[in-house]
């Protein structure tokens, strides 16, 4: 699918997650469809396993649940979520044929190979393989003056920058990711409260 950033009716599926480390066994994954004029016209929710290897399928499930043919790009809050549950960008792009971009906001100081091996001795090689396949991050300076680090497939660098700038209003977080993160956090709090009330 060709990405036309200047398209008036462009729609982005922004996906974020929320969990409590050491408490949650599941992480809430929330996806919202946002138009170029920042109106929201769809959302979907699922869960993935904290420390699991099902984040990629979680993203695909969100996309499938929406059953939309008008999504022009998928935007993710990073590729490592829910405590080292690694998203496979290539698999998502190959299965959806929709351009995809993953956004992070800080340089990583972590030695990921070491953490994968220490915490997941049974499948650390798989996690490392997926992570490396995602490639290196690129720095992009936004119109707000903030810099983000991105990985992308199905789009050029100038298209990635144009897409981010179209959906940014302030700071460094694009609106589809800001809103989907708020939704995921609210749902996680609701689930925790419901669990406490049922005890």
What function would you assign to each model-found segment?
Residues 1-22:
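Two-metal-ion RNase H-like nuclease active-site motif
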Residues 18-22, 78-87, 105-110, 155-157:
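Gly/Ser/Thr-rich loops at beta-strand to alpha-helix junctions
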Residues 20, 64, 121, 136, ...:
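Generic secondary-structure signature for well-ordered alpha-helical cores
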Residues 152-199:
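Charge-patterned, long linear interaction tracts outside catalytic cores
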Residues 7, 26, 50, 54-58, ...:
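Conserved active-site and cofactor/substrate-binding residues in soluble primary-metabolism enzymes
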Residues 88-148:
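Long, charge-dense
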Residues 26-82:
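A glycine-rich, hydrophobic loop/mini-helix early in the fold
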Residues 14, 75, 101-104:
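A structural signal for short, well-ordered beta-strand segments and their strand-loop junctions
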């Amino acid at each position: 699918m060709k990405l036309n950033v200047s398209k008036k009716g462009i729609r982005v599926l922004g996906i974020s997650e929320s969990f409590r480390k050491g408490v949650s066994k599941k992480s809430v994954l929330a996806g919202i469809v946002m138009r170029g004029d920042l109106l929201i016209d769809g959302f979907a929710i699922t869960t993935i396993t904290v420390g699991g290897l099902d984040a990629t399928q979680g993203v695909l499930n969100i996309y499938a649940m929406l059953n939309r043919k008008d999504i022009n790009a998928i935007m993710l809050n990073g590729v490592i979520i829910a405590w080292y549950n690694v998203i496979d960008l290539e698999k998502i792009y190959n299965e959806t044929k929709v351009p995809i971009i993953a956004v992070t906001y800080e340089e990583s100081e972590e030695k990921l190979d070491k953490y994968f091996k220490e915490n997941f001795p049974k499948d650390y090689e798989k996690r490392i393989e997926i992570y490396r396949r995602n490639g290196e991050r690129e720095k992009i300076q936004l119109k707000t003056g903030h810099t983000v680090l991105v990985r992308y497939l199905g789009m050029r660098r100038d298209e990635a920058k144009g897409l981010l700038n179209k959906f940014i209003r302030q700071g460094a977080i694009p609106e589809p990711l800001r809103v989907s993160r708020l939704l995921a956090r609210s749902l996680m709090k609701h689930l925790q409260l419901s669990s406490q009330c049922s005890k």
